[in-house]
Design a protein with these regions (language model features):
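PLD/PLD-like phosphodiesterase catalytic module centered on the HKD motif
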Residues: 8, 15-133
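Active-site cores of enzymes that catalyze phosphoryl transfer or operate on phosphate-rich substrates
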Residues: 1-7
Length: 133
């Protein structure tokens, strides 16, 4: 489906954990290849000079019990680690690989999160909006 997309791809999920390596090892924990497929599709659009965008909507923090930086937040921290490893952390991340080929990958892919805001007792307050799919 990713390979056949003509103009854009929209992904909305609680996590974005995927594999970007060209060849998987038997020891790799993450097996899904969505990020690799996105990488190939974006490169094809870039090389052919086509307008193409990928929109990925994920929450800023996973909706799990616990607090980041504490022993109760281990699951949150693990998910954030794998999200960031997929997106931007390390030479095998999606954005790192795209940056080797494309000067400005943000012309092709963007990562977004939702937040709402209001005034409460005269003070601005904000809250994360969680995506559950």
């Amino acid at each position: 489906m990713i390979n056949q997309a003509e103009h854009y791809i929209y992904i909305e999920n609680q996590f974005f954990i995927s594999q970007t390596k060209t060849h998987l090892e038997s020891t790799d924990l993450v097996k899904n290849r969505i990020a690799e497929a996105l990488y190939r599709r974006i490169l094809r659009a870039f090389r052919n000079g086509h307008t193409f965008r990928v929109f990925i909507l994920i929450p800023l923090l996973p909706a799990f019990e616990g607090e980041v930086g504490t022993s109760s937040g281990t699951a949150i921290q693990q998910i954030m680690h794998y999200n960031y490893s997929t997106i931007v952390k390390g030479y095998d991340s999606l954005l790192a690989k795209l940056s080797l080929e494309i000067d400005d990958p943000s012309q092709y892919i963007g990562f977004y999160s939702l937040r709402n805001h209001t005034k409460l007792n005269g003070r601005l307050v904000t809250e994360l909006i969680y995506i559950h799919r």
